[in-house]
Amino acid sequence: MKPIQVIDSHTEGNPTRVILSGFPIPKNKTLLERVNYLKKKQDHLRKILNHEPRGNGMMCSVLLMPPMIKGCDYSVIIMEQDEYVPMCGHCIIGTATTLVYAKKLKQKKSPVTIKFHTLAGIVECKVHIKNGNVDYVSFVNAESFLLHQNYKIKTKNYGKINVDIAYGGDYYAIVSADKLKIKLNLQNDQEIIRCANEISTEMLKKKFPHPKNKKINRCYMVQFISNKRIHNKNNSKTTVVAPPGAIDRSPCGTGTSARVAQLFSKGKLKLNQKFHNEGPLGTKFIGKVISSKIENKILYIRPQVSGRAYITGIN
């Protein structure tokens, strides 16, 4: 097997590993077919890249490929600890930062525009450069929406819980940590994971088909929210738990998209109003709704999320 060349970064605390070469690219015609091929034939490579000893508990890898559709710069497959996900915000910010760092783009003038073809749709990034270095990245995410309010589930140790189910490139069960009296700090990680796993187990018992893509139908991500913030200038604190129990160190890009969709649908966020979403480490993403529309009684929004990434290694 050829060596796999990667560049590592972290986005507001959460790692991304961008694959530049050495990884066999599937030859299937559609992005979904390529993902399914990797699941069946090459999943060992995902584990090699993401798991110990080469990876860690939150490592995510991004496979860069030539664009499969017109109007995009790259098609990408996003590989997490346990899943191939439709979209990942912190990975997109890390990937955009990596491409500028590695001088893989023709455009030099800030902001540099990059369009990624993901399973969730086309994601457009703008990389803002200051003094020759990446300052921050903004991306316009796939259409996001609130699917269910106060969806009731019953858990073993936490009783009946009301969750909001929102989509921001992936489905999230959004839960009030304050109501459950769960403290969102790193010292309380085991209780956070335990509760998230109980919620995720219940959510996976039912499918939630995406109104426009029935193949997206599983809600396995859990997003805890709280008003008890580290920095008072931020609007809310969040902790996202991904299967099989990994805490996202960043405020989570798709989770932020789902959150602003939830707030906008409830009338708690206005168009173009900035929402400062604080993660477990006190770092933040800034989300806002840049457009909205109603189709078949569902309010869809187009979210923009901004954050920063930093190069940590070349391997």
Positions of PLM-derived features:
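Glycine-rich ThDP/TPP pyrophosphate-binding loop and its adjacent helix/strand module
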Residues: 169
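A glycine-rich beta-to-alpha transition motif near the start of alpha/beta enzyme domains, typified by
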Residues: 1-164, 176-315
